[in-house]
Amino acid sequence: MAFAMSSSLTLFQYQSFGKKPFFSRRRDFAGCSMMNPLVARCNRATEICCVVRKDGEAESLVEAENDQLEEEVMKPTSIDSFSVVLRSERKKAERRTYLVAAMASSLGFTFMAAAAVYYRFAWQMEGGAVPLTEMMGTFSLAVGSAVGMEYWARWAHRALWHTSLWHMHESHHRPRDGPFELNDVFALINAFPAVALLAFGFFHRGFFSGLCFGAGLGITLYGMAYMFVHDGLVHRRFPVGPIATVPYFQWVAAAHQIHHADKFNGVPYGLFLGHKELEEVGGMEALEREIKRGVKVFSSSPNQS
C-alpha cells in the first residue's frame, strides 16, 4: 500500500528531540542548507514529499497526482453512466406501469360502452318496434359531444388549468417523477359526468335518456382518444406504434409541443385542433419547424414509439 510522507526538516527538531527520522538512517547535516552558510539563503522550511510503493520503488508526486486525478475523473464518468442506466430503466418501468393502467381503463370502458349500447337497445326493442329516433339521437349526441369536448378542453385548459387550477396542472409542465402526475386527476374528474350520463341513459327509457346515453358515449370516446394521442403520441408515456407517421397526428403532436414551449402565450390550448389555433396567431412557420424536428427525433429513436 502506497503512502505519502511529508516532513519539515529543521535544526530545532533534531537538536531538541534527538530522534531519528522514520525508515531512514541519521543523516549528516553538514551539507544541508540549514548548516552550511554558503547555501543559507535557501528556504529553511522545505517540504519533502514522496510516495513509497509496495515494491520499494519511489514514484514522483506528479505521477501520483496524475493517477489520482485520472481516478477522480473516471469515478464521476462511471457514476454518471450508472445513473443514466438507472434512469433509463426507471423510465421504462414507468412507461410499462402507465401503459398497463391506460390499456386496462381503455379496454374496460370500451367493453362496458359496447355492452351498454347492445343491451340498452336490445332492452328498448323488446316491444318489437325499433326506436329509430332514439337511436339517431344517441348517435348524434355521441358524435356531437366528442367534438364539443375539444372546445370544452380548450376553454378549460386556458381559463382554468393555467389559472386557478395551475397548482395541479403545473405537474404536467415539469419533468415527471414516476408513472403518474397530479394532472392525471383531470381525467378522473371528466370521467364522472360521462359515467353519470351513461348510467342514466342506460336505466331509463325515452328520447331524452337516449340523448344522455349518447353524450356519455361521446365524452368517453374523446377521453380515450385524448389519452392515446396526448399521453402516448405526444408525451410518449407509452408506445403508440405507426400512427406517429400519420401527417395529421404529426400536426397534433407538434402543435402541443409548441404549447409546452410557450412561444405564443400558451397557444394552442386545444389538442386535436391545435394547428388551427396556431394558424390564427401566425404560428404555422413554427409548426412546420416543430414537425420536421419531431420527424427527425422519431427517425433517430431506437424504440420509435
UniProtKB/Swiss-Prot annotation:
Transmembrane feature ranges: 98-118, 129-149, 184-204, 207-227
Catalytic class of the enzyme: oxidoreductase
Top-rank taxon: Eukaryota
Protein name: Beta-carotene 3-hydroxylase, chloroplastic
Motif interval(s): Histidine box-1: 157-162
Motif (Histidine box-3): 230-235
GO biological process, one term: xanthophyll biosynthetic process
Gene: BHY
Keyword Ion transport: no
Entry's free-text remark on domains: The histidine box domains may contain the active site and/or be involved in iron binding.
The keyword rRNA-binding is assigned to this record: no
Family: Belongs to the sterol desaturase family.
UniProt miscellaneous comment: High expression of beta-hydroxylase (BHY) and zeaxanthin epoxidase (ZEP) results in the accumulation of violaxanthin, 9-cis-violaxanthin and neoxanthin in the yellow cultivar Gower Ramsey, while the down-regulation of BHY and ZEP results in the accumulation of beta-carotene and orange coloration in floral tissues of the cultivar Sunkist.
EC number(s) on file: 1.14.15.24
Alphabetized Pfam families for the sequence: FA_hydroxylase (PF04116)
Function: Nonheme diiron monooxygenase involved in the biosynthesis of xanthophylls. Specific for beta-ring hydroxylations of beta-carotene. Uses ferredoxin as an electron donor.
Catalyses which reaction(s): all-trans-beta-carotene + 4 reduced [2Fe-2S]-[ferredoxin] + 2 O2 + 4 H(+) = all-trans-zeaxanthin + 4 oxidized [2Fe-2S]-[ferredoxin] + 2 H2O
Residue ranges annotated as motif Histidine box-2: 169-173
Lineage of producing organism: Eukaryota, Viridiplantae, Streptophyta, Embryophyta, Tracheophyta
GO terms under cellular component: chloroplast membrane
Sample GO molecular function, one term: beta-carotene 3-hydroxylase activity
Annotated motif Histidine box-4, positions: 256-260
Tissue: Expressed in flower buds and lips. Detected in roots and leaves.
Alphabetical keyword list: Carotenoid biosynthesis, Chloroplast, Hydrolase, Iron, Membrane, Metal-binding, NAD, Oxidoreductase, Plastid, Transit peptide, Transmembrane, Transmembrane helix
